[in-house]
Amino acid sequence: MIRRLLGVALLTGAITGCTTIQLEPLPEGMTNQPPADWAERSDHLSRFDQWQLRGKLAVKQPSDSGTAIINGWRQQGERYDLSLSSSFLGMGTTRLTGVPGFIELTLANGETYQSSDPETLVAAATGWNLPIDNLAWWVRGLPAPEGDFRLLFDEQHQLAILRQDGWEIRYDRWQPFIDSLPALPARITALNGDKRVRVVISEWQQED
């Protein structure tokens, strides 16, 4: 009898607990159900880890805003080599090289800085708050392997929004840059509170 009453109490508690969950409504025209080919598509993109892209970067935040040309962003697995040119804050050509958890930043005047905290170093040198370690994943249309995430898909079965680590990444446009791969992002807007980072990609290349 006691066991039966305990079971009823637990079941009642579980039902009561479930009724308190607040589900965030989905944006109109979007679903959190991945399309049938998502597993195959994301597998292709995750194995696409030797690449180079070119384009433009724009940052808007309360303290300032600015734009930069992405002369080249080369990714070899976890290792990145990113060259930016901008007149903002007299940056000139700035080079970022590193792996997750380590960065070397070289300014136009040749000064070089290293840090185990990439985001803090980039913010100190340029004034820009960029999610450096996650960008190589987000720019391909994939969540970073560390941290919870949420994916939302549009009516064309493309990834439309990725939410992770306090950022909302909106995939504004996809294009078939490389014949052997699914469509790749051509325009991305990343939002975090009052910060906005926009990347417009003009060229993707696959490297051996």
UniProtKB/Swiss-Prot annotation:
<feature type="lipid moiety-binding region" description="S-diacylglycerol cysteine">
    <location>
        <position position="18"/>
    </location>
</feature>
<keyword id="KW-0472">Membrane</keyword>
<feature type="signal peptide">
    <location>
        <begin position="1"/>
        <end position="17"/>
    </location>
</feature>
<dbReference type="GO" id="GO:0044874">
    <property type="term" value="P:lipoprotein localization to outer membrane"/>
</dbReference>
<dbReference type="InterPro" id="IPR029046">
    <property type="entry name" value="LolA/LolB/LppX"/>
</dbReference>
<dbReference type="GO" id="GO:0009279">
    <property type="term" value="C:cell outer membrane"/>
</dbReference>
<feature type="lipid moiety-binding region" description="N-palmitoyl cysteine">
    <location>
        <position position="18"/>
    </location>
</feature>
<keyword id="KW-0143">Chaperone</keyword>
<keyword id="KW-0813">Transport</keyword>
<keyword id="KW-0732">Signal</keyword>
<keyword id="KW-0653">Protein transport</keyword>
<comment type="function">
    <text>Plays a critical role in the incorporation of lipoproteins in the outer membrane after they are released by the LolA protein.</text>
</comment>
<keyword id="KW-0449">Lipoprotein</keyword>
<keyword id="KW-0998">Cell outer membrane</keyword>
<comment type="subunit">
    <text>Monomer.</text>
</comment>
<protein>
    <recommendedName>
        <fullName>Outer-membrane lipoprotein LolB</fullName>
    </recommendedName>
</protein>
<keyword id="KW-0564">Palmitate</keyword>
<dbReference type="GO" id="GO:0015031">
    <property type="term" value="P:protein transport"/>
</dbReference>
<dbReference type="Pfam" id="PF03550">
    <property type="entry name" value="LolB"/>
</dbReference>
<comment type="similarity">
    <text>Belongs to the LolB family.</text>
</comment>
<dbReference type="InterPro" id="IPR004565">
    <property type="entry name" value="OM_lipoprot_LolB"/>
</dbReference>
